Curated annotation (Swiss-Prot):
Organism this protein belongs to: Xenopus laevis
Function: Proto-oncogene with serine/threonine kinase activity that can prevent apoptosis and promote cell survival and protein translation.
The gene coding this protein: pim3
UniProt GO BP: apoptotic process; negative regulation of apoptotic process; regulation of mitotic cell cycle
CC annotations in GO: cytoplasm
Modified positions (Phosphoserine) in chain numbering: 4, 190
Main location: cytoplasm
Protein name (record): Serine/threonine-protein kinase pim-3
Key word Cytoplasm present: yes
Length: 323
């Protein structure tokens, strides 16, 4: 994760050349709400990269911690419509995912600037992303990995039910609550509306992308997600991702570097099947023998007995996909 040293939001208000953007976006948005500066106290930079810059802020009225993502309009590649206004698709996707579900980051508000959008989200504390969590603790034992992985599956299923596909499932986009082991899926900047037809665009993380994208630049959303879940599970139990180079991805060169259970190894191999149609559906992963074992997540401060998943509720039927 790239870090930056910006100390304020001053650069957010600077105008830039907007001639390449749709005319509708240039029109002022008339909304009946307080200006951003009167609602939120600006804090420090949390992270910065191609996605934009994320600030650690707080709400003035009650001191609630928030994260504010600054996205320059010139960097937005996918647009959507919200109440008749063109906005980054990321905002539309976050709006589509109801806030009642705890496993996905909650959108609180958004603002439009002449040259950028500000996306205001909840900022849970104390947390660290799963990448840092694994870096600090090393490979996870299978009970912990199972509990975490199940929560990721729940988040993905919830997104599917809302018509959203994340398209960038990875350890850096999962926040771990260090008090109770709860996970939250973040960063929908690479996401899309869920569809059954082929996608021909991808802005996620290369080493988590499926071989059909690397080879043919086309993929189906559900089967590509299952591939990334396989990479994630491998990362959890081995402490590192299985592939670094494109050749390793398209040849599915898996190296099991230490002893893990046969069931876990089999699930990883299934998710990382070369042919998309050979991969399991999300519900088949839930029903896999390795997933059905009793699990106990060990967090930094306490042991959390994860809730039992009702596999019969909120299920999404997925047909086999092939290119």
């Amino acid at each position: 994760m790239l870090l930056s040293k910006f100390g304020s939001l001053a650069h957010i208000c600077n105008p830039s050349n907007m001639e390449h953007l749709p005319v509708k976006i240039l029109q002022p948005v008339k909304v009946d709400k307080e200006p951003f500066e009167k609602v939120y106290q600006v804090g420090s930079v949390v992270a910065s990269g191609g996605f934009g810059t994320v600030y650690s802020d707080s709400r003035i009225a009650d001191g609630q911690p928030v994260a504010v993502k600054h996205v320059a309009k010139e960097r937005v590649t996918e647009w959507g419509t919200l109440n008749g206004v063109m906005v980054p698709l990321e905002i539309v996707l976050l709006k589509k995912v109801p806030t009642a579900f705890r496993g996905v980051i909650n959108l609180l508000d958004w603002y439009e600037r002449p040259d950028a959008f500000l996306i205001v989200m909840e900022r849970p504390e104390p947390v660290k992303d799963l990448f840092d969590y694994i870096t600090e603790k090393g490979p996870l034992d299978e009970d912990t990995a199972r509990g975490f992985f199940r929560q990721v599956l729940e988040a993905v299923r919830h997104c599917y039910n809302c018509g959203v596909v994340h398209r960038d499932i990875k350890d850096e986009n999962l926040l771990v609550d260090t008090r109770n082991g709860e996970l939250k899926l973040i960063d929908f900047g690479s996401g899309a509306l869920l569809k059954d037809t082929v996608y021909t665009d991808f802005d996620g993380t290369r080493v988590y992308s499926p071989p059909e994208w690397v080879r043919y630049h086309r993929y189906h959303g559900r089967s590509a997600t299952v591939w990334s879940l396989g990479v994630l599970l491998y990362d959890m139990v081995y402490g590192d991702i299985p592939f670094e180079q494109d050749e390793e991805i398209v040849r599915v060169r898996l190296c099991f570097r230490r002893r893990i259970s046969t069931e876990c190894q089999q699930l990883i191999k299934w998710c990382l099947s070369l042919r998309p149609s050979d991969r399991p559906t999300l519900e088949q992963i839930f029903d896999h023998p390795w997933m059905c074992k009793c699990d106990l997540v060990k967090s930094e401060d306490c042991d959390l007995r994860l809730r039992t998943i009702d596999n019969d509720s909120s299920s999404t039927s997925s047909s086999n996909e092939s290119l």
